[in-house]
């Protein structure tokens, strides 16, 4: 009975904190807050209400190596998609992410050729993590993705994918 009460209190606290604060902790590198939420029973792949991204999306976008590693160890889905169809590897191509994050995601099976949702008016289709890294001038990450078989959206479309 006591453990049920503790679980209910933890759930109420988490709901009262709003999911965005949990995700923001992942983005900001607040590893203790992320651990507390996970220890209290937060679903590792819970999505926020605004961008529909998981903790892992936010940690990757924020360049938080330790939190990415923690979340992967906790069973986070490295191929989860957010509201734009981006995976955490798509976000690893931004200007705050590190090569370590891309390496961790790829080592755990991130799809290097995942395509996000096509923006309106684009004829070539969605963008891959390689496209995102290239646009972000993240040559080291782009080379890593390419080394693991990553292609651009245009290359995939030319192949009929």
What role is predicted for each listed range?
Residues 30-38, 64-72, 97-107, 138-147:
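Ankyrin repeat structural motif
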Residues 24-30, 58-64, 91-98, 123-127, ...:
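Ankyrin repeat A-helix N-terminal signature
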Residues 47-49, 81, 115-117, 122:
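Ankyrin-repeat boundary/linker signal
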Residues 51-52, 85, 119, 126:
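Start-of-repeat signature of ankyrin repeats
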Residues 119-161:
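Leucine-rich solenoid repeat scaffolds
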